[in-house]
Amino acid sequence: TYSDDDGETWANPTDITPMVKADWMKFCGTGPGAGVQLKNGTIMFPVYCTNGNGKQSSFNVYSTDGGKTWNSGGSPNNGGDMQNASNELTESCIITLDNGHLMQFMRSYNGVITTAVSTDNGLTWSETTKHSGIVDPYCQMSAVHYGTLTDPADGRQKEAIIFSNPAGGGRKGGKVRILSLIHI
């Protein structure tokens, strides 16, 4: 749905499921994260699905016409034929980096945060990277792109990402971290 009067009234909602859910998907839904608008105007939201084997996969949906029509983007773990639980990826969040690339942070069964990068607006994704220093107790996380900062210690430019999730077992002990990507 949408509002064109600052939220005073809303249009009737439109079900986009038929536009984005493939036949092999048993379930398709959004995570609790927010969407992003790319530099070219594309609107993108992270979603996840299950296949016929009940295995989960992260992917994204996007609109290039202001939300009138929607398409499915790529998946870092090719959910249609996935069999291996250790490769499952579920709820996720997407941020846009300074160079225009997308970074997707994904919940998984691996016990650590998993990420992938797209250089083509989410149509394809890099191999996933597991970050051993960031615990993932299988709970939704949040990532927000902050911008580029200069490290006073070494003068290097570092792209800052504000990241939050539970820091230990279960859904407790929330922690907010500043992650950085070093610009070479």
Q: Which residues does each predicted region cover?
A:
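Asp-box/BNR beta-propeller blade signature and adjacent active/binding-site loops
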Residues: 1-182
